[in-house]
Amino acid sequence: MIASCLCYLLLPATRLFRALSDAFFTCRKNVLLANSSSPQVEGDFAMAPRGPEQEECEGLLQQWREEGLSQVLSTASEGPLIDKGLAQSSLALLMDNPGEENAASEDRWSSRQLSDLRAAENLDEPFPEMLGEEPLLEVEGVEGSMWAAIPMQSEPQYADCAALPVGALATEQWEEDPAVLAWSIAPEPVPQEEASIWPFEGLGQLQPPAVEIPYHEILWREWEDFSTQPDAQGLKAGDGPQFQFTLMSYNILAQDLMQQSSELYLHCHPDILNWNYRFVNLMQEFQHWDPDILCLQEVQEDHYWEQLEPSLRMMGFTCFYKRRTGCKTDGCAVCYKPTRFRLLCASPVEYFRPGLELLNRDNVGLVLLLQPLVPEGLGQVSVAPLCVANTHILYNPRRGDVKLAQMAILLAEVDKVARLSDGSHCPIILCGDLNSVPDSPLYNFIRDGELQYHGMPAWKVSGQEDFSHQLYQRKLQAPLWPSSLGITDCCQYVTSCHPKRSERRKYGRDFLLRFRFCSIACQRPVGLVLMEGVTDTKPERPAGWAESVLEEDASELEPAFSRTVGTIQHCLHLTSVYTHFLPQRGRPEVTTMPLGLGMTVDYIFFSAESCENGNRTDHRLYRDGTLKLLGRLSLLSEEILWAANGLPNPFCSSDHLCLLASFGMEVTAP
């Protein structure tokens, strides 16, 4: 009985005493560790061999990690390591505890900690102030792009891993892999002006090149000389005396339009999109190529009158400008040097026609008739006039019907201005941004002079995009434009294709015979002398003769024009200066890159009859007339423009490339 009582009473008391002694030991040890500054204890203790006594030490260490880590770090940052006397006295208090069963293991642990504290005094590297606030390592990859190293954790993570000494942790921190440092994105968002990526749909984000782009080398354009190359007839373009001149066509990108479609220019640095920067670049480009005729599109009105026109006037140009109708702020301009040409007439063209749904857009054109000025050294010679047309056609890829109608109006105006007294045409140059790709129906219509459009999907006219997947497509119907427009299906004004009527009306014999027995003709005039056999008889009206004479229908006097069914034509015989293909690279030519997709939409057409030459590639595919192509500035491929970060860029300040060609006109004796 007594033994049972002792068993039930003494055993819990023993366990309680042991728990109190453990708590006292833990408290003493926490005080010591709280005043310690070296986490080397953690590293050595973590690497100690495991044993029965080690399990309790590991539990105490885990509690120290959870409760006293922040205090250890703060204490370490405030002062130097603790002195050895304090460490030895603290260890002595722990060693004098008679109730601790694992005193031997504690003795070994204390000895190791004391040696570690002595070794910590000889450390050369100071303890970092805050492990979690190390500065980010910034790596400059490309100009304008900032890349930073991976940020360190705010608190060291010790769970489920062996602890490392502070020295090892600091060393590993500064010896990070360079590849990781170079390609780890900083958590801070990169400003838009420092971004240098191409967010084009379907192309992902392209990293900018790591070196500075040599724009002058990448965008170098060769001059192609045709003056010694024979044409289809075997004649060289440079034979005989000629009046030579150069013409440039350039869409210079209106600032207002750029700001309205800013999503198209996210790949550009904001500085190169500034108008003042772009204006200087454009003027330098004009001065470098020094054309005799300059045809510009997307010319903003205020920039034209305030900067462009005065600057071009100082360069020796005379300029004509036509702003787009409606509330649009840009337009077209044609400039020429008065030392080379004399103006005969200028005709602005508006495509907007009130009341016609087909022609409700604000695009415009400009047609000039220029007389070349022959140098005095050539003597008494003459040169035919030159007709120059500049336009910017509607962009909308789905409205090919509008594009064709606008082009028909421009061709009718060119036909009227360029028509000579004998019915032929003087040399013609038609240029501008036509918003159509090569070999599209609109392009073929200009080059071939004929197009069968009836039933054609409207999106197919320009070839810019493929909308064949759409169920309901707008198709072209005949006639394409109403007769009230006053333009025939041959793209001529009705008043131009028929001879002008004289103010005096002319009547035929049959019409005049209607008045033979009218009432006034059957009355004897007063005072008429009676002459036998001549005036003595009264005219007798035949039976059934109408007394009243019907007037001739006015519509019969007006010449009527017939409409062809689904076909439009023109007789200007135009061909393109460019072939739209780069044989050296095996790539198509590119004049612009909307949304990162290179295409040709800018053209220079001139008067020259196209012809077929089979497989002969050494001759040009047209016959030279009065106007001869002497040379052109080569275009670039899409890959080259991609290498230059697209358009615009610091070297080219427009989203289009300029087109430049040299021509020669025959000089004849008067």
UniProtKB/Swiss-Prot annotation:
<dbReference type="GO" id="GO:0005634">
    <property type="term" value="C:nucleus"/>
</dbReference>
<feature type="modified residue" description="Phosphoserine">
    <location>
        <position position="105"/>
    </location>
</feature>
<dbReference type="Pfam" id="PF03372">
    <property type="entry name" value="Exo_endo_phos"/>
</dbReference>
<protein>
    <recommendedName>
        <fullName>Protein angel homolog 1</fullName>
    </recommendedName>
</protein>
<dbReference type="InterPro" id="IPR050410">
    <property type="entry name" value="CCR4/nocturin_mRNA_transcr"/>
</dbReference>
<feature type="modified residue" description="Phosphoserine">
    <location>
        <position position="77"/>
    </location>
</feature>
<dbReference type="GO" id="GO:0003824">
    <property type="term" value="F:catalytic activity"/>
</dbReference>
<dbReference type="GO" id="GO:0005741">
    <property type="term" value="C:mitochondrial outer membrane"/>
</dbReference>
<dbReference type="GO" id="GO:0005783">
    <property type="term" value="C:endoplasmic reticulum"/>
</dbReference>
<dbReference type="InterPro" id="IPR005135">
    <property type="entry name" value="Endo/exonuclease/phosphatase"/>
</dbReference>
<comment type="similarity">
    <text>Belongs to the CCR4/nocturin family.</text>
</comment>
<dbReference type="GO" id="GO:0008190">
    <property type="term" value="F:eukaryotic initiation factor 4E binding"/>
</dbReference>
<keyword id="KW-0597">Phosphoprotein</keyword>
<dbReference type="GO" id="GO:0005801">
    <property type="term" value="C:cis-Golgi network"/>
</dbReference>
<dbReference type="GO" id="GO:0019904">
    <property type="term" value="F:protein domain specific binding"/>
</dbReference>
<dbReference type="GO" id="GO:0048471">
    <property type="term" value="C:perinuclear region of cytoplasm"/>
</dbReference>
<dbReference type="GO" id="GO:0005829">
    <property type="term" value="C:cytosol"/>
</dbReference>
<dbReference type="GO" id="GO:0003730">
    <property type="term" value="F:mRNA 3'-UTR binding"/>
</dbReference>
<dbReference type="InterPro" id="IPR036691">
    <property type="entry name" value="Endo/exonu/phosph_ase_sf"/>
</dbReference>
